[in-house]
A protein has these predicted regions:
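A generic alpha-helix structural signal
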Residues: 1, 199-202
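Rossmann-fold NAD(P)H-dependent dehydrogenase/reductase core
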Residues: 1-134, 209
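Residues at helix-coil transition
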Residues: 6, 164-166, 207
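C-terminal helical subdomain
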Residues: 63, 96, 120, 143-185, ...
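A short C-terminal helix-loop "cap" of Rossmann-like NAD(P)-dependent dehydrogenase/epimerase domains
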Residues: 81-84, 136-146
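Intracellular terminal tails of multi-pass secondary transporters
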Residues: 203-209
């Protein structure tokens, strides 16, 4: 964040794409389960730290996933942020992807009429290194399927680029996209009370780091 802020030019877009997936055992960073910390808090720190450098108009694009459908029934388990209770790798990943969507919706609300937008997306199932923590059999199956059903990295980036640059979505904010089109989320991913609570909990954690 500091290195980017040291530059002179404003930012036309901030694209959040870092992530981890399917870590076999529960691990934590600063007391938060590692998927949730890396995939959500990392982006929260980056975006909130750079908002004062975001141009107007400017855009924030956050990579989520349809895996948000695998999040816990409560959405975000605030009483289990360590992730130790009932840990399951894809459930933890799903919670982090739900957090991406909730964060983006709340950010879009906060940006309001500033001429800045925030949107999120499902990139598709892509042949990248993020699957490296999957069990060996699952990795082998994905390698076999890759030429037939998996997107390339370039194809997976298409919706990110669309949301970051297309005039067609210049006034769209707080939305979820897939394959460059609006897409549906689970009802809990549209819960603005939950989104506001996640923002507050995220701010509290970042203040302690």
């Amino acid at each position: 964040v500091a290195a980017v802020k040291a530059g002179a030019a404003p930012l036309d877009a901030i694209i959040c794409n870092a992530g981890v997936m399917a870590i076999p055992e529960p691990r934590q960073a600063f007391g938060w389960e590692l998927h949730l910390f890396t995939n959500h808090i990392g982006h929260f720190i980056l975006v909130t730290g750079l908002l004062d450098r975001l141009a107007s108009p400017g855009r924030v694009v956050v990579t989520a996933s349809n895996a948000h459908r695998r999040a816990p029934a409560a959405g975000i388990e605030f009483d289990n942020l360590t992730g130790v209770r009932g840990y399951e790798p894809m459930r933890a990943y799903g919670q982090s992807k739900l957090a991406n969507i909730l964060f983006t919706r709340e950010l879009g609300r906060r940006l309001g009429t500033k001429g800045q937008t925030a949107n999120t997306l499902h990139p598709g199932v892509i042949s990248t290194g993020i699957t490296r923590t999957l069990p060996g059999l699952a990795q082998a199956a994905m390698r076999m399927a890759s030429p037939l059903v998996l997107k390339t990295a370039a194809q997976g980036a298409a919706t990110q680029c669309y949301l970051a640059a297309s005039p067609a979505v210049a006034s769209v904010t707080g939305a979820y996209y897939a394959d460059c089109n609006p897409s549906e989320t689970t009802p809990i991913a549209r819960d603005m009370t939950l989104a506001a609570k996640l923002w507050a909990e995220s701010e509290a954690l970042v203040a302690r780091i």
